[in-house]
Amino acid sequence: MSSPLLTLNNGLKMPQIGFGCWKVDNATCAETIYEAIKVGYRLFDGAMDYGNEKEVGEGVNKAIKDGLVKREELFIVSKLWNNFHHPDSVKLAIKKVLSDLNLEYIDLFYMHFPIAQKFVPIEKKYPPNFYCGDGDKWSFEDVPLLTTWRAMEELVEEGLVKSIGISNFVGALIQDLLRGCKIRPAVLEIEHHPYLVQPRLIEYAKTEGIHVTAYSSFGPQSFVELDHPKVKDCTTLFKHETITSIASAHDVPPAKVLLRWATQRGLAVIPKSNKKERLLGNLKINDFDLTEAELEKIEALDIGLRFNDPWTWGYNIPTFI
């Protein structure tokens, strides 16, 4: 079983269904990645900030060594964290990523957020998360996004990265970046679920030839274990009457409806699971179609509910306002 492929604006192929590495426990990560490759996953969406790239690399390299897959058949993703936006820091970041993954290159490198924090040396704290080197004090770095992007373009030219992309960007920032870039973003990764559809942003990205990957496809479910305050105020999508009724009509689990709603509209998805049967089930989401009426019913659930918002991190960062 394998995922359908999407053709990026640089001609490279990207699996439409991948495995998201966010919150995958370090203790079981390598084994989980290995098992995911065994059942057919080829795209692994990771990040510096996830703190598990060494384990992801262990799983990937074991699968390659055991002959389950060739490196060129995989699509490995990482993301540049906020503390590494200075051009010199971008080079340090990719070296760290490749070292942790034990790979010579990655297939896609996102700018994780359009936020430049103060640089924190790797040996001091890694991943730094929201630490800026001075207790709880938040410090920005005076580095424009285009400056960071040009340093990322150099990674492509040097063969360390095949494609570069953007994550958590709004339309105006994308437009500004396109005015000055040499290499256009190949992919935009955004929070996307029925409570936060962002149709105009998706339409704009598509008109610019930028593929869209959805994260947190299950909405509040992704944030339950983080004790996110907004989770308490909304119905889980797995139990929402609209989703469950559509799932019953197709005799599939609610999760499959949520993922198919995205892929049927051309988006890529990156769900995760530690259970083999769910891993396989998530790969098979394109074996049925939702009706136009069902697609519209799901989209009608949109209430603009964003869970991953830097403004709520305690530092009033104006990413989405």
Swiss-Prot record:
Name the pathway it acts in: Carbohydrate metabolism; D-xylose degradation
Entry keywords, A to Z? Carbohydrate metabolism, NAD, NADP, Oxidoreductase, Xylose metabolism
Please list the reactions this protein catalyses: xylitol + NAD(+) = D-xylose + NADH + H(+); xylitol + NADP(+) = D-xylose + NADPH + H(+)
Query: What Gene3D superfamilies is this protein classified in?
Result: NADP-dependent oxidoreductase domain
Root EC class:
oxidoreductase
Question: Per UniProt, where does NADP(+) bind?
Answer: 167-168, 216-225, 272-282
Record InterPro entries: AKR, AKR2B1, Aldo/ket_reductase_CS, NADP_OxRdtase_dom, NADP_OxRdtase_dom_sf
The UniProt function text for this chain reads:
Reduces D-xylose into xylitol. Preferentially utilizes NADPH as a cosubstrate.
Q: What is known of its domains?
A: The Lys-Ser-Asn motif at positions 272 to 274 is important for the cofactor specificity for NADPH over NADH.
State what protein this is by name: NADPH-dependent D-xylose reductase
Gene field: XYL1
